[in-house]
Amino acid sequence: MTEQQPIAVLGGGSFGTAIANLLAENGQAVRQWMRDPEQAEAIRSRRENPRYLKGVKVHPGVEPVTDLERTLADCQLIFVALPSSALRKVLQPHQLALTDKLLVSLTKGIEAHTFKLMSEILEEIAPQARIGVISGPNLAREIAEHELTATVVASEDDELCARVQAALHGRTFRVYASRDRFGVELGGALKNVYAIMAGLAAAMDMGENTRSMLITRALAEMTRFAVKLGANPMTFLGLAGVGDLIVTCSSPKSRNYQVGHALGEGLSLEQAVSRLGETAEGVNTLRVLKEKSDEMQVYMPLVAGLHAILFEGRTLAQVIQLLMRGEPKTDVDFIPTTGF
């Protein structure tokens, strides 16, 4: 199925560009909106996004644009790849233009002052729109370089899921569907925090046992927190949970992993984020997640430990000592431990 109208991708970053390329390769006409006219002109003239995805050719079917009002008017299916800190500011003035649109969030973040996920913000801005999210183990550069990849589109709107699958599904990109939008989106946001910790552990040359422990305990923490908020724990055993967690905590291509690695090399948080040159959602998510988990009294020792290192002046050695002294609880929280 080929969309009769062009499809919009909002955001000029690496992931937005990778998704725009996939759509164009599948025969779709794509309008990729970005705020910076110089960036748009660079992509238009060089067919490359030199700032965020250097070395990857941008498909001729991707048209970089800077007129947001016209882009929203022309397109029915709209992928939103804006930073979490900018999403509301960019789209709020155009809420009438979003009525009855299909809005699919690609952003894995949480709004700091409200603890709202991106799809919840989209619902606030455009209550008459149809909302979905995409999440999974999806490193932008690997998608752009046609590594075999799978993702999840999640929405209670089955037709929206089907349209996204038809638009994106291709020879190297497989799209599964889920109705647990909240769980899928929450998994994508939470794992960024643990990727920072994984990068820090790698820079400190910690062993494979340690890294495995961190990833599996991170999964337990994520699931414990998400279930308290009403998500389906089974979602965290799929691509948007353990799948995304593994790739983000294992790959130097992950932005949040890079921030953690830079911290382990001795850089300050400000220096680490500055060196990255892109948005690392995990830093902001850590702040709001620590506050929310304390408020809800959810046991999240890894979150508390990383927060202590980044924002409370604790050293890694001090935090490790506290973590290893903690009382060990059950390994898996969501099955009975009696009768086995």
From Swiss-Prot:
EC top class named in words: oxidoreductase
Residues where sn-glycerol 3-phosphate binds: K108, G136, K191, D244, S254, R255, N256
An example Gene Ontology biological process: glycerol-3-phosphate catabolic process
Residues bound to NADPH: S14, F15, R35, K108, A140, R255, E281
Catalytic reaction list: sn-glycerol 3-phosphate + NAD(+) = dihydroxyacetone phosphate + NADH + H(+); sn-glycerol 3-phosphate + NADP(+) = dihydroxyacetone phosphate + NADPH + H(+)
Principal subcellular localisation of the protein: cytoplasm
SUPFAM superfamilies: 6-phosphogluconate dehydrogenase C-terminal domain-like (SSF48179), NAD(P)-binding Rossmann-fold domains (SSF51735)
Localization annotation: Cytoplasm
Biological pathway: Membrane lipid metabolism; glycerophospholipid metabolism
EC number of the protein: 1.1.1.94
Active site: K191 (proton acceptor)
Any one GO molecular-function label of the UniProt entry: glycerol-3-phosphate dehydrogenase [NAD(P)+] activity
Cellular compartments per GO CC: cytosol
Keywords: Cytoplasm, Lipid biosynthesis, Lipid metabolism, NAD, NADP, Nucleotide-binding, Oxidoreductase, Phospholipid biosynthesis, Phospholipid metabolism
Classification via HAMAP family: NAD_Glyc3P_dehydrog
Reported function: Catalyzes the reduction of the glycolytic intermediate dihydroxyacetone phosphate (DHAP) to sn-glycerol 3-phosphate (G3P), the key precursor for phospholipid synthesis.
Database matches in PANTHER family: GLYCEROL-3-PHOSPHATE DEHYDROGENASE, GLYCEROL-3-PHOSPHATE DEHYDROGENASE [NAD(+)] 2, CHLOROPLASTIC
Family, similarity comment: Belongs to the NAD-dependent glycerol-3-phosphate dehydrogenase family.
Identification of the protein by name: Glycerol-3-phosphate dehydrogenase [NAD(P)+]
Biological source species: Pseudomonas paraeruginosa (strain DSM 24068 / PA7)
